[in-house]
């Protein structure tokens, strides 16, 4: 990313915003500082679901509480937040998915600036 930043700094047409994607459990104050130093204005994180049982069933390796913590850190740093949600995950159902999507905008610990929805399709031979 450092090389891309250096190219942008001397480019005729400059990037005015940088959006980075990561996992909620990888967000730290140090990581946010590095992102801001690169000119990051928005971070996209893959929450996927708000139900910890669904996250565990799908081997996400993170909890919704990790997302709450990450979003607070990023908002405190002035970053715009995009969350990725994934309906149709194994272990969920349509009612749970609707509740998860409602929670994204009703829970004060979430409330992102941007939402991306990626419906899950489990492929043959997947561990899921």
Where are these regions (language model features)?
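Conserved non-cysteine loop/helix-boundary elements of the Radical SAM core domain that shape
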Residues: 1-82, 86-124, 128
